[in-house]
Amino acid sequence: MTVKCKAEESLTCSCVDVGTIIDGSDCSVEVHQFYSTEADANAVLERLTKKARNTESDPCEIKSEIVAVENGVQLNASFTFSCQAEAMIFELANR
């Protein structure tokens, strides 16, 4: 999962405006992980999908693929939520 930091710290109070963290622009979470077997990758995808469904207010768009790589498989998945707050909740729930 990737998280981009766009926050700019205020020099007067060492704080950050919430609008710089949640600006509504990043509603997607990308997952790229390696597993020994396709069954392991499918189990994780099922768990992530369930978490996404529990987080969504409007349907989350989920795209995924499992590709064979040397010594295993790679899970590539994209979860696009209706708002950035849901994407952040999903990311935090998977840490």
Swiss-Prot record:
Disulfide bonds: none annotated. GO terms for cellular component: cytosol. InterPro entries: DUF406, UPF0234-like_C. It holds the Pfam family DUF406. NCBIfam families: DUF406 family protein. Belongs to the UPF0381 family. This is UPF0381 protein HI_0400. The lineage of its organism: Bacteria, Pseudomonadati, Pseudomonadota, Gammaproteobacteria, Pasteurellales.
